[in-house]
């Protein structure tokens, strides 16, 4: 029993899919062991009297039999099972739940829309980086949750009865992706939103985060098409035109859209367009977690840290036994360089955060081997779970670590889309120089330096006589100037 007592499971009986998340608590953080998702489409089994059909209930029970096998090893006090919109609505929900509890061997709780919204917000707060004041949007199968909050505290919570399955049945029942169907779906969604829009706007937000299958699908489409990961109304309208061009649901083909997500994509898209329009949202990114993560973190009683990224970096440093003093030393030199060139290069605050994060992890590759350490570092960062960092930011970190030394692979810096290619090049230059000047691993051996930028030309001024007193240092810097010149990055060192 010992090894399973640190396991926790969260199950969410959604209107479109049933999900199970099994995690292990490791040093105040969670490690995902299992994620199982089955499209049960429970909401599609509701008739006009809100009764669930026997077929839909059987689909649900069948899925729970799979989940039950995995739950046998976990203490019941460490399992939470919640049911959402469809089972809130269904007049015969009691029949479904009685049998579900029998199959799973633990209680199933039907939670209110507000409680669902609160849990979603907690899941986002624990796993998503960025500004503290946020609006969270989760489009489910039969309900849509909208929550504003600051840090761990929610300021307003709404659960609206519209979702991608119910809107599919209502506005795309004929499987026709015409303009009229989209117009009707958007108009109806805006009417549902209108009564709550003022309060959401009153509380306000600095960032907007999406936490649902629809937003996940959009992210996959944009990554597949090489776009940056920010969701904007313009991109949503382009995708709508693409869907209209396809004509029918069974013919819907968009690069990066999986068959599994395609069925409810147009209805989810219509709801999201309505939300963007009604609330005047400029830009949305994908959340790191939502309802299931909220359940798990709730069971673990872990507090929400102000800075998720810092917690992630600390955990990774401990796990891979990275020399934290050296990571801080490189970060300090890089920050000093960054602050000197930031105005000339018009860099944004997020770029500084990502550069410092790369410094914190730059030696992770040594945990595999000194040989090819940059390649090992890039592989690890690309494949590790890094709460607080978006997929595009992870890719940028991996690319910076790949190019921390040796000749520069310019194409890799251009293939990430977290920042413009030119910014990726600039961050790479600063990281490489910081690593060189902190390489003696002692604070008192880092020279006083000034770094000036004039367009792409970097001029580094060292203390008088430093180069003659440090022949190895001079050799390394000469080699670096040469490598930077190969990719047209002019570097002068005095």
From Swiss-Prot:
Keywords for the protein's UniProt record, in alphabetical order: Hydrolase
Gene Ontology biological-process annotations: guanosine pentaphosphate catabolic process; guanosine tetraphosphate biosynthetic process; nucleobase-containing small molecule interconversion
Originating gene: gppA
Protein's recorded name: Guanosine-5'-triphosphate,3'-diphosphate pyrophosphatase
Enzyme Commission number(s) from the entry: 3.6.1.40
Pathway it works in: Purine metabolism; ppGpp biosynthesis; ppGpp from GTP: step 2/2
Top-level division of the source organism's lineage: Bacteria
Principal EC category: hydrolase
Higher taxonomy: Bacteria, Pseudomonadati, Pseudomonadota, Gammaproteobacteria, Enterobacterales
UniProt family annotation: Belongs to the GppA/Ppx family. GppA subfamily.
One example GO MF annotation: guanosine-5'-triphosphate,3'-diphosphate diphosphatase activity
Catalytic activity: guanosine 3'-diphosphate 5'-triphosphate + H2O = guanosine 3',5'-bis(diphosphate) + phosphate + H(+)
Organism, scientific name: Escherichia coli O6:H1 (strain CFT073 / ATCC 700928 / UPEC)
Record's function text: Catalyzes the conversion of pppGpp to ppGpp. Guanosine pentaphosphate (pppGpp) is a cytoplasmic signaling molecule which together with ppGpp controls the 'stringent response', an adaptive process that allows bacteria to respond to amino acid starvation, resulting in the coordinated regulation of numerous cellular activities.
InterPro entries in the record: ATPase_NBD, GppA/Ppx_hydrolase, Guo-5TP_3DP_PyrP, Ppx_GppA_C, Ppx_GppA_N, PyroPPase_GppA_Ppx
